[in-house]
């Protein structure tokens, strides 16, 4: 999805705003890695050719083939179709993803835009893809926002009725820090400050007291269901294998994923939830534009 697609959706720019708030200026994640329409419009044909020549080379590519295949035949076909493409012996260095100081305190912003209802967005820096702490954090997000029985949905949507929806998930990155992002849309007539307070209260409760045995069992079952669904689709399998090969140099990780999640304990989930602190928090509110007013970002 390009940035122009995000711009044209209600709340669509929230992802861009969260990146800019969670990562410092100059960091590669401060802006979307896909770039912007402004970048594309400013690029010359030579810029595009140079970029292609620099990065699109066989020694910088991963080809994944899944299914009931003849391995020798596939290797021969790859050699036939791609073997004549020259490698790039001078691949550019990847950008430095090192993060200096932590957030060091809550970062807050309000955006007035053409949206139907106020919506709360949260972000927290998180462990990297491949870190042993990330699966525990993903289980924490399932406990907090995985379906109707999750803590946030039960408390904010069904019990207190301050939100129309509630979500929390991990955006895994391989450098700097991953990001946990959450959101909740204010129910008409409800109080925005109360919605935010209740959302944060549920995050704090998991960090303070950890999950119950029932919650751990439910979260593992949800993740197992997602894994089984992924493995029923060849395209999803190929995408997952390709991601692990490209980012972690570990294509076989897909065969260990389920065991990794099943091996996470409640104490590890509670420890992972410690990232939900005010010192590591980005708060972004979207508010509808009043009639006749201009959007602000």
Per-region residue spans from a language model:
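A common structural junction motif
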Residues: 81-89, 200-211
